[in-house]
């Protein structure tokens, strides 16, 4: 989990705000530079006292669990028969608890993968998602939804309205059939019907049944697929015609998982079902959807032609979390009803003990199973494996139909005698070019072998493959012939220059410098002469080996402790090579992260390569077709030069004539039949080798053999060879964290070297002294480094300062609490919030922005993040016009206030009055933050901060810049701004899918945030505050943010605008403020909205007042 000194996205910012035990202190101390090796022991000891207590309690429970259960069973066995009903009730209660736990764990795994897949689709535009909701209370019915946005509803943009269809919302304990009908513009847009007699749901869109789903009841044995939402999408294009698409949950999963069914599909609408068109139109700058009850929709827009995939995936993600929250609420209600029945009868402690212990035992087992453990595995081979290199050769065919000509040293060669006159004994040769257009369809070597091995965790197969890069690359190879010593092939008659017409000779196919290396007794060629592809010198020969670690947690990686040795036999010579295994984290085609060991060794380090010949095996029906006679002109006779091939020089050279167009036809398994030779195009002179040396370091591939210097090469893995590797396992194949980290190897090495002898991560994290020792070892030899660097270096996968692994512990802890609701006072918010926190944690671990690399099919979209749009934006809101107030303000008072994306700002609360002490504290805090404070000043601020009595008022400012059409828009979200006033009046709320409206009184907390939106259409940076309704804040929230009581009569629009501008002025010009920390980050589409939504949804939990220590605690 990334710390605040390395914020990359809004989820990281949210983690700064989360009230997780012991995190705020560590974050604050890292920020203030107070964490060093010297004071680390005392600091962690004080910080983690509570965590040690929790760990000790868990340990004691596990030790005494079996004893407690035995006692409980003994006591229950003493019960009389009159207590049978009581035992039945207890069993019912226990069953409910375990059933909820089982269902929650099942849904957790299901939704986890769904959420992780969704996080792979990050927005590639700066166009936002606008939420809109309509309550089911008819008295509060809104006739229409009008979204007024400047420069949005034009012919340059498309708009989508996305509505969820939640099957879980229609499943309840009622017996009658349930239906939901939504009308748009007088038409039945869609209807959903649930038949309880067979638990089947029917979805109709515009009168057509688009899906039929069999449902499972909540609380019984569930099927996770039943709880995945489907989507109804209305797309309005340039011509104002609305298209209706239905996207079932199955198609969403296929789209996210890159199903083979959709290999060539790139747009989400391609996998959706297009139902029809509607009569809805977009006119006069607004969109209207009339008479829509029970609707929780999202409205998005982007330039025409730009895919809405990422925004729709983000919307779907939020609906997934809503569904889980609803399910959890229903489960808790069910549990409470059973518990009420249990508590209505008098029970002894023994009665209640047994189900509680069983539940605790199950949860502890689940926690243990979900905890990654450090494993040391030794992978060995049972027996000696001998394999011909050719049987594991894999060649990539890189030829295409457009590759028509290959260069070659093949040549026709003949001696001509004149019976009358001279010259005599003239040596003439004609080089040949080869047509390779049919090589694209040739079948070539594509083999590998699995060598059986064993490890401590079971069988480990080693996949072996030989690769020779570029062996069938038209840019890197030529055509040559391999044939036995002394072989001659007659293939055309030739008339020599100036010779009488009756004198001619037979042109013979000449051999290349590689020919004499291939003696017939050593090389079993099917024909005496075979064509082949000749690769350049120094071509590598890679022996590649792969071992899959299926039980590993990919996010935590691993480290190879010891490599093994393999051998290459070449005749009587044996060459030994050491493997070079590395731990690689990769994403499979299904989108799942996996871990494997990969080794690639170039054997030419000991067996150098001067030449490669890939023989195209001649078939029995291969034929060399004779050509017509040809007359040749005299060109460059008797010229000599030299030619170098590899380490050898060939000196006896004679002139010859070049002729093009020698056709080569490919047959199955790369079989070649030479075609008719064309001697009509004589181009230029070249040289031809007539005499040869031998002994070239040549590789020749013939059938299943690879020959080196004429001898077949054999691969051997000696018996007993072993590879030792350390990695982290996840027994449930459902690891606590599932991260995509481009620096996984380095991170895993840090973790393993910290304490490679530990049995598990849990053991390391539960022992403070071990953790301190591990940290200090990591710090050596530069002990002056701060712990923040160590935490950052391991990518936040396991925080050495946080002993409980991952937010799944929080989830399990909540389930444990549910088992005893009378003591814990738990409600469904706790479990829902825990799961949301876990999803956000998993998302930020999986995608650490800034470490991603191109080429990952699941993450390619991240390459197009609109960072340039933000970084190139020159219109900073320096001056803000406030039209209702009739004034303009210059924004900011800090040097690094203007250009940052996230600021944490402190203001003097003046609790100590105006005077030197107040000024001195402000200056001291500023010096600490700027690393300019002395030892005394640092410790003073640290002590005040730890006790949360630092006399300053904190708030956070998050800035997001967009360009919408021709308008530059800056959204500034302030959190921690309320001064303790309350939100007056009543608040109405409806549960997802529920028709009942709940009236909640006494909601006495501030909104927790204020959203200032300013826009500009000019290049000079003059920004103007927008209408307050664009911010999405209500009248109540604006009055609460201003610290004013809401009037008894609703204020006018102009009055609210005046108050809105006053808040903007106060926040942008506040004197005495300074930025404690700022972060340059890229806020992607929807992230600012998501963060704001988190604040809103947690208002009832935290009661945002933000005064005194609350604000400091929040901003920590």
Curated annotation (Swiss-Prot):
Give all residue intervals belonging to the PPPDE domain.
929-1116
Keyword line: Capsid protein, Host cytoplasm, Outer capsid protein, Virion
Q: Where in the cell is it found?
A: Virion; Host cytoplasm
Q: What cystine linkages occur within this chain?
A: none
Instruction: Please give the GO cellular component terms listed in this UniProt entry.
Output: host cell cytoplasm; viral outer capsid
Q: Which residues cross the membrane?
A: none
Major site of localization recorded for this protein: virion
Q: What InterPro entries does the record tag this protein with?
A: PPPDE_dom
| UniProt key word S-adenosyl-L-methionine | no
Task: List the catalytic residues.
Answer: 953, 1111
Task: Name any one GO molecular function.
Answer: peptidase activity
Highest taxon of the source?
Viruses
**How does it associate, per the subunit comment?**
Interacts with host ent-kaurene oxidases OSKO1, OSKO2, OSKOL4 and OSKOL5; this interaction.
Instruction: Tell me, in a sentence or two, what this protein's role is.
Output: Minor capsid protein present in the outer capsid, which is required for adsorption of the virus onto host insect cells (Potential). Could play a role in the host plant virus induced dwarfism.
Identify its protein family: Belongs to the phytoreovirus minor outer capsid protein P2 family.
Return the protein name. Minor outer capsid protein P2
* Organism expressing this protein natively: Rice dwarf virus (isolate Fujian) (RDV)
Q: List the top taxonomic levels of the source.
A: Viruses, Riboviria, Orthornavirae, Duplornaviricota, Resentoviricetes
